[in-house]
């Protein structure tokens, strides 16, 4: 059977909080089968746990946050969640001594490195996949996102970014997901934003950790980062990275195809909630090794 995965060892790193601009320590711990993905704030007494859950997600102008019934939140979870999806990690405890996951370089690549450093351990329990059985679509004005049946995991994403520095032919990406494709083609894509928005947020004491070190920053005419883009389609690639993390808020890899136009965290989350609210739209699936879609056949141990 295809088995659940966790980490082999505890790993730790430090980074800067996007909101606070302060140092954040991040610790990833192995977890037993069927634990799921648990985010934990250790700066609170007692510590507060936030299980990955589509219904706990709150989208903000800056990031994705998980919020519990008491209104306590943990922010900026999206890129680490994408890395967990990319590596197929089912069970992990994620500890931070702050209200947010560190932003690192604005991509998922540092988290991939951290997970690979910990190593992957397989557990004696079947891995459960969420298989899409019928199309589900969410629309918001001209924006839309849908999940349809597909024997694998494919993402077909289009953005519409009218900017002189962004080529019109670099605004669509179709990806057949695998751990290898995520690590090689997706994980290094950074988040992006406009200088005017960052300056405004910082004037309001927000986004104090935002910088050229952890985002692609644009003005009305050009990309302001000295090194430019890591690859020509980095912006749409980051939107795909975000979607992979958003869909993994159900705690399971999805078997299906996501198609989207101008979608973001909020629409992605609405789509996942709509699927989970319709019991005829999905089923839980486990696989023997020879049955699994090739997408999910190999753990992601390729070095980034």
Swiss-Prot record:
Q: Is Metal-binding set as a keyword in this record?
A: yes
Q: Does the keyword Oxidoreductase apply?
A: no
Pfam families, A to Z: LpxC
Residues that bind Zn(2+): 79, 238, 242
Q: What is catalyzed by this enzyme?
A: a UDP-3-O-[(3R)-3-hydroxyacyl]-N-acetyl-alpha-D-glucosamine + H2O = a UDP-3-O-[(3R)-3-hydroxyacyl]-alpha-D-glucosamine + acetate
Query: What InterPro entries does the record point to?
Result: Ribosomal_Su5_D2-typ_SF (IPR020568), UDP-acyl_GlcNac_deAcase (IPR004463), UDP-acyl_GlcNac_deAcase_C (IPR011334), UDP-acyl_N-AcGlcN_deAcase_N (IPR015870)
Q: Which residues form the active site?
A: 265
User: Under which pathway is this protein filed?
Assistant: Glycolipid biosynthesis; lipid IV(A) biosynthesis; lipid IV(A) from (3R)-3-hydroxytetradecanoyl-[acyl-carrier-protein] and UDP-N-acetyl-alpha-D-glucosamine: step 2/6
Q: Which domain of life is it from?
A: Bacteria
Enzyme Commission identifier(s):
3.5.1.108
Keyword terms, alphabetized: Hydrolase, Lipid A biosynthesis, Lipid biosynthesis, Lipid metabolism, Metal-binding, Zinc
What is a GO molecular function of this protein? metal ion binding
Q: What class of enzyme is it?
A: hydrolase
Q: Which SUPFAM superfamilies match?
A: Ribosomal protein S5 domain 2-like
As for family, the record states:
Belongs to the LpxC family.
Record-linked NCBIfam families: lpxC
UniProt name for this protein: UDP-3-O-acyl-N-acetylglucosamine deacetylase
Q: Which organism is it from?
A: Photobacterium profundum (strain SS9)
Instruction: Please name the gene that encodes this protein.
Output: lpxC
């Amino acid at each position: 059977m295809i088995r659940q995965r966790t980490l082999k060892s505890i790993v730790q790193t430090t980074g800067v909080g996007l909101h606070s601009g302060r140092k954040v320590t991040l610790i990833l711990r192995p977890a037993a089968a069927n634990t799921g993905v648990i985010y934990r704030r250790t700066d609170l007494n007692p510590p507060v746990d936030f299980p990955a859950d589509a219904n706990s997600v709150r989208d903000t102008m800056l990031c994705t946050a998980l919020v519990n019934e008491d209104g306590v939140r943990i922010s900026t979870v999206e890129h680490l969640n994408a890395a967990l999806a990319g590596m197929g990690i089912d069970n992990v405890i994620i500890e931070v001594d702050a209200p947010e996951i560190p932003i690192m370089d604005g991509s998922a690549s540092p988290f991939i490195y951290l997970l690979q450093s910990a190593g992957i351990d397989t557990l004696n329990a079947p891995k459960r996949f969420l298989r899409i059985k019928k199309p589900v679509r969410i629309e918001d004005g001209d924006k839309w996102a849908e999940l349809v049946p597909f024997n694998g995991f494919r993402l077909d994403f289009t953005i519409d970014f009218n900017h002189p520095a962004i080529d019109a032919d670099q605004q669509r990406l179709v990806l057949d997901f695998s751990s290898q494709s995520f690590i090689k083609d997706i994980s290094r894509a950074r988040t992006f934003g406009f200088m005017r928005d960052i300056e405004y947020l910082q004037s309001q004491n927000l986004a104090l950790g935002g910088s050229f070190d952890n985002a692609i920053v644009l003005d009305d005419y050009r990309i302001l980062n000295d090194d430019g883009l890591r690859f020509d389609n980095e912006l749409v690639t980051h939107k795909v990275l975000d979607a992979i993390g958003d869909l993994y808020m159900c705690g399971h890899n999805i078997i299906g195809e996501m198609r989207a136009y101008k979608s973001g965290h909020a629409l992605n989350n609405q789509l996942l909630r709509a699927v989970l609210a319709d019991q005829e739209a999905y089923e839980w699936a486990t696989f023997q090794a020879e049955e699994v879609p090739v997408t999910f056949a190999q753990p992601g141990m390729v070095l980034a």
